[in-house]
UniProtKB/Swiss-Prot annotation:
<feature type="transmembrane region" description="Helical">
    <location>
        <begin position="15"/>
        <end position="35"/>
    </location>
</feature>
<feature type="transmembrane region" description="Helical">
    <location>
        <begin position="396"/>
        <end position="416"/>
    </location>
</feature>
<feature type="transmembrane region" description="Helical">
    <location>
        <begin position="340"/>
        <end position="360"/>
    </location>
</feature>
<feature type="transmembrane region" description="Helical">
    <location>
        <begin position="282"/>
        <end position="302"/>
    </location>
</feature>
<dbReference type="Pfam" id="PF22776">
    <property type="entry name" value="K_trans_C"/>
</dbReference>
<feature type="transmembrane region" description="Helical">
    <location>
        <begin position="251"/>
        <end position="271"/>
    </location>
</feature>
<keyword id="KW-0813">Transport</keyword>
<feature type="transmembrane region" description="Helical">
    <location>
        <begin position="218"/>
        <end position="238"/>
    </location>
</feature>
<protein>
    <recommendedName>
        <fullName>Low affinity potassium transport system protein Kup</fullName>
    </recommendedName>
</protein>
<dbReference type="InterPro" id="IPR003855">
    <property type="entry name" value="K+_transporter"/>
</dbReference>
<dbReference type="InterPro" id="IPR023051">
    <property type="entry name" value="Kup"/>
</dbReference>
<keyword id="KW-0633">Potassium transport</keyword>
<feature type="transmembrane region" description="Helical">
    <location>
        <begin position="140"/>
        <end position="160"/>
    </location>
</feature>
<dbReference type="InterPro" id="IPR053951">
    <property type="entry name" value="K_trans_N"/>
</dbReference>
<keyword id="KW-0406">Ion transport</keyword>
<comment type="similarity">
    <text>Belongs to the HAK/KUP transporter (TC 2.A.72) family.</text>
</comment>
<keyword id="KW-1003">Cell membrane</keyword>
Length: 625
């Protein structure tokens, strides 16, 4: 019996430990700034029991209702084979509603994702600057070097991204677990001094706060958005853990530690109002302060690294779903494909971080520019979830819809309370999001138009093969593969090959690689083959958006299904379109020029599908768009 209890205890601790870095490391540094920043917005909040108890009550119930009930109970149940995130939710919702509304859902999903991108690139700056500014309060000489130190840390952080392997996750999880325990212990000191602070859990203090400060009270959410928006990144990463593991680690470890610390800070501010500028480190004993500063910097780097990893993952997902051009993606771990590194995204975000710090300079200004994109994304997540549950027949349907409607109303007020940030610098992430959206929609629309343009005169494959018999073309030994982007259409590469070379191989494969909405495709459903006439074969390979197509794997399944193929005896014919700008209105001409630029800088099928370079024959085709 004792052995069973020990195993259960060990299992519980392992659950917390395994999720702590990936899911909750992002929120780890927030106790340093969340309380003090709630008071510095010049909204007339007095440093008294009413304000302190009220703000603590708001933090507690907001985290409970939005992060725990909304996300960890309801939203995580809406997933695609365990995968979450706004793109996944968009895809699931689009399937549930009528086709006329699908376009609107997709556009809203893309807009929210891009705006969220614009916001989350600010979080690393906030995490790192918050710690350095706290250090400068105790070590005044640091104040002159905040900018230089921040840039140095960012340079180090972005430089090591390619070196970080999945195996480091255990080290990061251990450090963040220790940090959360330390955060809780620091808070306990304040609670011990004034235990009455725990009464702030009572929602009556929240109500009294809103009664007294009226509309101004909502502006507290301008700071709290930093805490609650982390739930969107948590939703993106749910695929690596079970729902029960995520709920346990939040409810029994992370949430209590954060709230204990917040209550401790509230207690010390009530007793020593002068500590409002640095309540977190005010609770730390003098002898432990240097260690805590050092540890906090390390945690801020790990927290920032998690943000960057989430950005890499979202980018790869967008690439695989066809919303971004093919770009170089490196897998830094042989064990799990989630640990990836994307050089161009890494350095774009590094440049963005440098610009942020250069323009906005301090923590308060950085917090002022954060929140618009996040709350829009959170509201759309709620809206999409409402549509999902409305179409789904299940238990407690009415209760779920009522709860989500209530949350949507609350999020509307949070949006209003953050809207003033647009004139305070909030335009920065919005502009970034608009640029990102423009790139995504341009690539998706123009790629589709290009496919239509290059295939609109094509006959069906079977008719094409039938007509080839009349030409009596010379046949040579070996196998040729022609990449096809659309079903039942003739690849341009074979048309140009026949036109210029006037020969065909004995075995000809029309290969169509499809990316499905699911994260993974079962191995037994990976490849479908169709035997056509005259030595022609049709092959369709299916991959999930989390998987990377591999020509060797496709050939392996083809061999199992009856086509004898050898990569080193196969020639791959790939079309290389040279795009020329045709006559268009000026606004469409700008979009076309952007597409031409993206197309020229995107990677071709050779890299995308790991095709051996010495087996590739590229055929240049000039296309007017």
């Amino acid at each position: 019996m004792n052995m069973i209890k020990k195993n259960k205890k060990k299992s519980f601790l392992c659950t917390i430990f395994s999720t702590i870095n990936v899911l909750h490391g992002l929120i780890a540094i927030s106790p340093i700034y969340i309380i003090k920043e709630s008071f510095v917005n010049n909204l007339g909040f007095k440093i008294d029991k009413l304000a302190i108890f009220g703000i603590l009550s708001i933090i507690f119930w907001t985290l409970f209702f939005i992060i725990f009930l909304k996300y960890l109970i309801l939203i995580v149940s809406i997933n695609n084979s365990g995968e979450g995130g706004i793109l996944t939710l968009m895809s699931i919702t689009a399937k549930k509603i009528n086709s006329k509304s699908t376009f609107v859902i997709v556009i809203l999903g893309l807009i929210s994702m891009c705006l969220f991108f614009g916001d989350i690139i600010i979080i690393p700056s906030i995490s790192i600057i918050s710690v350095i500014e706290e250090i400068s309060i105790y070590y005044l000489s640091f104040e002159k070097f905040i900018f230089i130190i921040s840039i140095a840390i960012f340079t180090f952080l972005f430089f090591i991204q390619k070196k970080i392997k999945n195996e480091f996750n255990n080290i990061f999880s251990f450090l963040i677990s220790i940090w959360f325990i330390l955060v809780g212990l620091i808070g306990l000191k304040g609670i011990y001094i004034n235990p009455e602070i725990l009464l702030a859990i009572n929602p009556k203090y929240l109500i009294n706060f809103f009664k007294h400060y009226k509309l101004n009270a909502f502006f507290v959410f301008g700071t709290l958005i930093l805490l609650i928006s982390i739930s969107e990144i948590l939703y993106i990463n749910i695929g690596r853990f079970s729902k029960l593991e995520i709920r346990k680690s939040w409810l029994f470890f992370v949430f209590p530690m954060i709230m204990i610390n917040c209550f401790g800070q509230g207690s010390i501010i009530l007793l020593y109002p002068e500590s409002i500028s640095h309540p977190f480190f005010f609770l730390v004993p003098d002898w432990a302060r240097f260690f805590t500063f050092t540890f906090a910097i390390i945690i801020s780097i790990i927290s920032s690294q998690n943000i960057i990893s989430s950005i890499f993952y979202l980018t790869r997902q967008a690439v695989r779903l066809g919303y971004l051009p093919n770009i170089k993606i490196f897998y830094t771990s042989e064990v799990k494909s989630r640990r990836i590194y994307i050089p161009c995204i890494n350095w774009i975000f590094y440049l963005s971080a440098v610009i942020q710090i250069s323009i906005f300079k301090n923590l308060h200004n950085l917090i002022l520019i954060y929140g618009i994109g996040s709350i829009i994304t959170m509201s759309l997540t709620t809206f999409f979830s409402l549509l999902f549950f409305k179409k789904k027949f299940e238990k407690f349907k009415i209760l779920k819809i009522t709860f989500l409607l209530t949350i949507l109303i609350l999020e509307f007020f949070i949006f209003i309370s953050n809207s003033y940030k647009i004139i305070c610098g909030g335009w920065f992430p919005i502009v970034f999001g608009i640029i990102f959206f423009t790139i995504m929609i341009t690539w998706k629309v123009e790629t589709f138009n290009l496919l239509l343009h290059t295939h609109n005169n094509s006959n069906s494959i079977k008719l094409f093969i039938k007509n080839l018999r009349k030409n009596n073309l010379l046949k040579v030994n070996g196998t040729s593969v022609f990449m096809s982007s659309m079903d039942n259409t003739i690849p341009l590469s074979i048309i140009h090959n026949i036109k210029h070379n006037k020969v065909l191989h004995e075995k000809i494969i029309f290969l169509n690689i499809k990316t499905e909405d699911s994260p993974f495709i079962k191995k037994e459903c990976r490849v479908e083959i169709e035997k056509l006439n005259n030595g022609f074969w049709g092959v369709k390979a299916y991959y999930g958006f989390k998987e990377t197509p591999d020509i060797k794997e496709i050939f392996h399944f083809c061999n199992l299904l009856g086509i004898s193929l050898n990569i080193m005896e196969t020639s791959f014919f790939i079309s290389h379109e040279s795009l020329i700008l045709g006559k268009r209105p000026w606004y469409l001409a700008i979009r076309a020029k952007l597409f031409i630029f993206l197309k020229r800088n995107s990677l071709g099928s050779t890299y995308q599908y790991s095709i051996p370079l010495d087996r590739v024959i590229a055929l240049g085709i000039q296309v007017k768009i």
